[in-house]
Amino acid sequence: MKNTKPKVRLWSVLTGLTAILTVAAIVGNIIANQYATTINVALNASTYKIIHGENTGDTEYFKKGFASDEEREAYEAELCATVEAEGAALLKNENNALPLASGAKVSLFGHGSVDLMYGGTGSGSVDTSKAPNLKQALEAQGITINQTLWDLYSSDSMMSKYSRMTPASISDTLEANTQYAVNEAPWSALSSAESSLAEYGDAAIVVLSRSGGEGADLPSGENGTSDNWISGQEGDGNYLALSAEEIELLQNLKALKDNGTFKNIIVLINSSNAIELDFLNPEICGEDYGIDAAMWIGDVGQTGINGVGQLLSGAVTPSGSLVDTYLYDNMANPAMYNFYTQAYPNAAEYNLLTEGADVQGMYSVYQEGIYLGYRYFETRYEDVVMGTAKAGDYNWATTVAYPFGYGDSYTTFAYSNFNVTESDDAFTVTLKVTNTGKTYSGKETVQVYFQSPYTDYDKANGIEKAAAELCGFAKTDVLAPGASEDVTITVKKSELRTYDANNAKTYILDAGDYYFTAATDSHNAVNNILAAKGYTLTGAKMKEIQAVNACRRDAVAKGMKLEEAMDKWQTMEQLPAEYRS
C-alpha cells in the first residue's frame, strides 16, 4: 500500500493557503475600492483615457480667469477681505468708540488677539501660513499697536501655558472631540506690560474667540454643557459663556478706563458659535464692564482680518447682519435641551462604545421642528403680545441680546415708499432707502420678511408657521449722506409654501392674508406686522399686555376658563389691583 500522507498534508496546506488568499483578496478588494481615489493619487495612476475624435472643438468648458496663480491668489485675498468687511455685524457703538481715529494707539487683549479663529474644523479649516494677523491688519490702516503687550501674548511661555484647548479636527474618540477650554491668561500674567498701557490708551480691544465645528462638536452634557471640560481654568462647563479669566480681564480694563488709562473698550466676537452676550448689558449681567463697542466678526477666513481693520478704522462702514439670534443665556433656547448625545441601544453589542470608536455609537434627537432660532423667539413673542393661549411667561427683551438680522452702522438710514405688487408667480417689493446721517457713507442691508395665515386647517393638521420668515434681502450701493437708492426684491410665491406632512403630503399655499415688511432684523419685522394688525407696541403697552396675560394665566390656573378670562380682562384698567403695579 502506498503512503498518501504527504499528499494529504500538501493538499491541506494548499487549501488553507487558498482560503487565506481568498479572504485577503475579498477584503483587499473592498478596501481598494473604498480608497481607490487615495491609492490612485499615491501611485500617480490615471483612471481615464482621452480619445480625440475628428471634431476638435473647444472642450475647455471652464476657462481660466487669471493669467497666473499669483493674480488669482491676490484676487482671492481681496475677495475674502471684502466678504468679511461686508459681513461683520456692528452690535454696539457708544461714545463714538468706533471708528478709531486716524493714528490711534491701541492695546490688544485676549489670547485670541494673537491667535485668531480663522476658520472652523473639518472642511471649514483654513491654511493660516499666509494669513495676516490683527496687528498687521490694523497697522495697514494707520493704527499703532502696543508692541510690548503683543510680544507678551505672543511669547512662547504665554502661548504654551495659555492657549485655547480644542480637540483634533476629526477624531474617532468622543472624549477627544469634547476637549474644549478657553484657557485665557489671568490678569496677573500681564503685569510686565502694565506700564505700557497708558501710551496706547486710545482703546483697549478685546478679542473673544471660540472654536467648534465638523467632527468637533461643542461639549454636550445633560443641559448642553459638559461637566468634564471647562470654559476657563475654573469654569462651569459652559464653553460659550465668558470664562472667569475673561471676566477678570474686563473688570480690570474697566478700572483702567475709570482712571483714564483707556478711553474706550472695544470687544470683537471672533466665533461662528453663538457666545452668550449678557456681559454687553449691565442690566442683565448685573455688572458694568464699561464696554463701549462690540462687533461680531465670526471666523475671518485667510485674509478676512484685513476687512476687520478696514471696519475698525472707518475705511469701510459696517453693513453686515447677524445670521443667528444671540441670547443673554443660551439655556433660554429650548433647542439646547436636544443638544446631547446618547448611545444606540445596541451600540455595545457592535463594540461602538469602545475607545477609538465611541463617536459612531452616539446620536442626537431633534424635536424643535421649525422653531429653531428666530422662528422660535419671534413666534413666541407674537403669541405673548396677542395673548395667544399657552404662550406662557416669556419676556423677549430679557432673553434676546441681538435678533437675527441685526447689524448697526456708523450712519443711519430711513425707509420710504414701501410697496408690494403681485404677479402670477411672485411678489415684488420696492422701497426707497436714504442715508440720513451727516458724516459717513455706507451701505444698508434691506431684509424682507413675510407672515402667512395660520388657518384652522393648519392647526388641525399639525402645520406649524413662524410669526415671520426671511424671504429676501438686498444691499444698497455705498450711499453718501443724504443720498437715496430704490431697492427691488422679488419673492417667488413658491417660497411662501408650507409642507403639509400629515394630510396633503406636499407643499401647500394657504388662502388668506399675507403680510410683507421690510425691516432691519427679525424682531422689527414682527413688530411691523403686529402694528399692521393693530397692536401698538410702546413700552407701556408691552407692560400692559404682559400684565393682562399674567392675570389671565393666573385666572385659568384658579379655575376660570380661558375664554372667560380673555373676555373679562382686556386692558390694564380692568385688572385686579395686584396686577396693576
Q: Model features per residue range: what roles?
A:
Residues 1-581:
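C-terminal non-catalytic regions of proteins with extracellular/luminal or membrane-system context
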